[in-house]
Every structure is written in C-alpha cells, then in structure tokens.
C-alpha cells in the first residue's frame, strides 16, 4: 500500500541521515591535528631554530615557541610566549602569522621582533624590514607597521601606540647585550 511504502521511505531516509551523520562525526574525530613542536629556552640562553618553511627564528631566554612539524593549509602559524626575532621566508600564498596572548602579527617576507612575556606590563612588535600587519582586540583593530616602527601594547591600560625606538636597543638581546 502507499502508506506502507511512505513509512519505509521515511525509515530509510532517517537511517541514511543517521549513518551519514555518524560517518562524518567519526571521520572528523579521526582527523589528526598537525604535530606541534615546542622550543623552550631557559634563563640566560638564546637559540636559533629553522622552521619547516625555512624561516629563521632567534628565541630569547625564558621564551616558548610552538610550531607545527610541517606547515599545512593557507597560513604558516606559530604561537609565542616570550620574545623572538623572525626572519620570515617569503611566501605570498601562505602568510606567516605569530600569535601571542595580546595580538597577532602577519608577515609575507620580513624581519621583525615580538616581545610578549606574560609577566610584563607591555607587549610589543618591532619591524626591522619589510612590513607586517598587527591585529589586536579580538582581531577587530589593526595597523600596518613600516620599518623602524614598533607597536607597543600596555596591558594595564589596554592602550596601543606606535613609536620609533632605537632598533639597536630593541635587538640588543640578540647580541647578548642588556639595555
């Protein structure tokens, strides 16, 4: 009868939706996130590392850099707690992104310094060459830095400002100097 066939079709459709949903869920559960590597630099040390894309990173003491074993997808993203200098290998199709608690820095091929120690009142990004896009405030505010500019964020006042520091002071730690 027509009613019996209609019930059979409804049951078949419900089973198809259920099986499809379970299959999609299981496929997503089995998808592996890229393996993350951690570079922790103890007190009174610095370390040079080369990321999988060829980007050179000099990491300051008491800093941690998290990065994937292999960059995949549309961007090359790392997470920094502390301070590091990045000499980014150019790749216009895959922007290089450094994330910290306070802001995100996007570069295509440039050299810049990020200082984002959680215990410090200020975090900053200083541009040595090229250009970078710095975003903050849940990525709703942004500015593009030019060479020899530094964006500084005061965590207590939640204020950002762009200054023109002495770059020798900004990079003194890379030469083992204290400022």
Regions found by a protein language model. Give the residues of each.
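A residue-level detector for the "anchor" residue at the start of short, highly conserved motifs
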Residues: 2-179
């Amino acid at each position: 009868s027509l009613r019996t066939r209609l019930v059979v079709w409804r049951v078949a459709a419900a089973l198809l939706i259920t099986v499809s949903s379970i299959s999609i869920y299981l496929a997503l559960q089995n998808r592996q996130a890229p393996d993350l590597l951690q570079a922790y630099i103890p007190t009174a040390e610095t370390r040079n590392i080369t990321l999988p894309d060829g980007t050179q990173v000099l990491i300051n003491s008491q800093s941690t850099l998290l990065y994937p074993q292999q960059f995949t997808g549309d961007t090359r993203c790392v997470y920094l707690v502390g301070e590091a200098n990045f000499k980014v290998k150019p790749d216009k199709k895959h922007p290089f992104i450094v994330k910290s608690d306070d802001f995100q820095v996007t570069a295509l091929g440039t050299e810049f310094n990020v200082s984002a120690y959680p215990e410090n009142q200020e975090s900053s990004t200083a541009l040595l060459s090229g250009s970078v896009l710095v975003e903050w405030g849940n990525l709703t505010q942004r500015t593009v830095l030019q060479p020899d500019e530094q964006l500084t964020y005061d965590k207590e006042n939640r204020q950002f400002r762009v200054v023109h520091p002495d770059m020798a002071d900004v990079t003194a730690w890379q030469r083992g100097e204290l400022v």
